[in-house]
Amino acid sequence: MADDSATPGVRVPSHRYGRHYHRRKIKEAVDSISSLPDVILQHILSFIPTKLAITTSLLSKRWRHVWCDTPSLSFNDYRLEAPFIDETLTRYTASKMMRFHLHTSLINNVPHLESWIKFAMSRNVDHLSLDLWNQVANKFKFPDFFHINSSLKQLTVVLDFSDTMIAICLKKLYLSTCLLSDESMANILFGCPILESLTLDHCGGLRVLDLSKSLRLRTLEINCNIWVPELTAMQIVAPHTHCLRLRNSKLPCSLVDVSSLKEAKLNICIDSFSKTIKADFLQVTLLKMLEKLHNVEKLTLGGNFLQILSVAELRGVPFPMFKVKDLTLETVIFQYVIPGIERVLQNSPDLKKLTLLTKDFYHKPGEYLGDHMDLEGFNLDQCWKSKYGVFWNKSCLDVESEHVVSFVELMLKNTKALDKMVVLLEDHYVRFKEMVPRLSHNYNISIALYTFKPQS
């Protein structure tokens, strides 16, 4: 009997045939992947959680033991219990481990932590990552054998504790949500003599971060130091550091010695605008930071940082000169960043490359600065007006194509030696796209435009 869905000359596949066809295509895809060498399959599996990688053993006999020799193990489900992890380690066969990641919140796992770390060390692990929740972290101490390991190159620690650690071969250290003291940090640094990169993420308690004895440390990143004793700015002594990235939440840091710095990325986040910290204090502190960047050639400034610099410019506070050759501005386009940007550009005579990134960066509403300037007696209709006569949008939500064009022209007018500009913005600014060739021709520079679709 003919299929009811058929017509003369055309036969529409039945649902049964469609399912069979779909299964066949999946099988062909699996077979195609299965033909790859083990080393490639294991490299692919190293990018997914180990629990998921183990499920590939059900695909076929070909896959049964592939996961056992992957270069990395990742136990990223904090609910995983000890029997599962123990069984996984028993079946693991790789002699060399690149990365071991453990995320757990189960208090019952605490007695097993030392043996799991010891297992990773026995496989000469390069990168050890521990993310332990409070109730687990409070009962955990680094075992003695950890201190004499010679293979560990990178350590990521997410713990609510302060402790000392010694890892003589460690090159990268990432500490998150740790309560530190100057003494404990000094002990950690003493135990890591060849450390090259240090990241402090949401750590608190430090008054002075002294890196003067870390002769190989080249990269320092501090993200939201959440607590500073007595609201004093943390001092940074880093004479050997080449790259500095700061994003502070309570107070900007005080740069005591960064004499070797070549690259810097600076911003302050929302808490820096709390009522307990005045804008005039912030402007003084931020300008002191900029004065320490006299040798920096690659500089990135965030939108909140630029807003405070705008206040300083409107008040007539002198800015330092810069040797910057590559400048990136991570900001939305609105009136509260204009004066600060103009002054930074004018004080950067050697600038060759300028990058504008406008992609959804979080900014404190500029109205705060407007209210602050109003209290100081400024004419708000004039103080935020560009010297070129442009009146800017007050809200970062009201950016039109003409604002983008005016913004780019303003930056071009305030530079003298610029060779290249890179602009990243949302793709609906059609008029600006049309203006790029003219701007490039008029100012004799190369403009690279990259667009993206805004998130819905």
UniProtKB/Swiss-Prot annotation:
The keyword Repeat applies. CDD domains: F-box_AtFBL13-like. It comes from Arabidopsis thaliana (Mouse-ear cress). It holds the Pfam family LRR_At1g61320_AtMIF1. Keywords: Leucine-rich repeat, Repeat. The keyword Mitochondrion does not apply. LRR repeats lie at residues 177-202, 203-213, 228-253, 278-303, 333-358, 396-422. Residues 30-78 form the F-box domain. InterPro entries: F-box-like_dom_sf, F-box_AtFBL13-like, F-box_dom, F-box_plant, LRR_At1g61320_AtMIF1, LRR_dom_sf. It comes from the Eukaryota. PANTHER family: OJ000223_09.16 PROTEIN (PTHR32153). Signal peptide: none annotated. This is Putative F-box/LRR-repeat protein At3g18150.
